[in-house]
């Protein structure tokens, strides 16, 4: 079955949802925008008509919002709200725990328990299990394993079998995902280390809130297109959620500001 056929379904399984996303996010950048989004809207309307189904209220609202917009951009979270996805899988995209970047960062700290800078499949499975338990949902271990594998395939952009902070952050709604803004200001390791040492003014090996404030102000000043100084407090709060009792160590800040080097 093709992605277009899946759109005709009354309920879409987790595996079908992945296929739909993979098909329409044709450039693999983690978002549907421009032509991709318009193709999806057009084919969604055609598929529902072909199946003799009306657009659901969520679909109508979505088409009204993005149908004419040339600058529209949606992520996986937004797509999950539109399609009639199986209930337990849908819960991951409606999680109250992940409504803001700050909440997300705190969640990341909890599950990246070994501070490796990524979450492996076992850590991801624990994360998903906890989300379901918070929603008072119990599912069989085999189903949880299936969800974990699908999520890994869906978010693992570089196919290394584990999720980095920016990859898992696609569980956040686009508007909330401040990490998107920082993609354009990441530094190479040499630049990052130099900046860290410059702003770690007392040389104690970590950056505190005031030092981070100074660093972010300078970044906003140098990168006005990407970063908005009016959002400085939000950036700071979200990044400090990665800190250890107010101490932001090099490895944690690197997750935000240091580009991966191959």
UniProtKB/Swiss-Prot annotation:
Ca(2+) 1 binds at residues 25, 27, 29, 31, 36. The modification N-acetylthreonine is found at residue 2. Ca(2+) 4 binds at residues 200, 202, 204, 206, 211. GO terms for cellular component: cytosol; dendrite; nucleus; postsynaptic membrane; synapse; terminal bouton; vesicle membrane. Residues 12-47, 54-89, 99-134, 143-178, 187-222 form the EF-hand domain. This protein has four functional calcium-binding sites; potential sites II and VI have lost affinity for calcium. PANTHER family: CALBINDIN. Belongs to the calbindin family. Buffers cytosolic calcium. May stimulate a membrane Ca(2+)-ATPase and a 3',5'-cyclic nucleotide phosphodiesterase. This is Calbindin. It comes from Gallus gallus. The gene is CALB1.
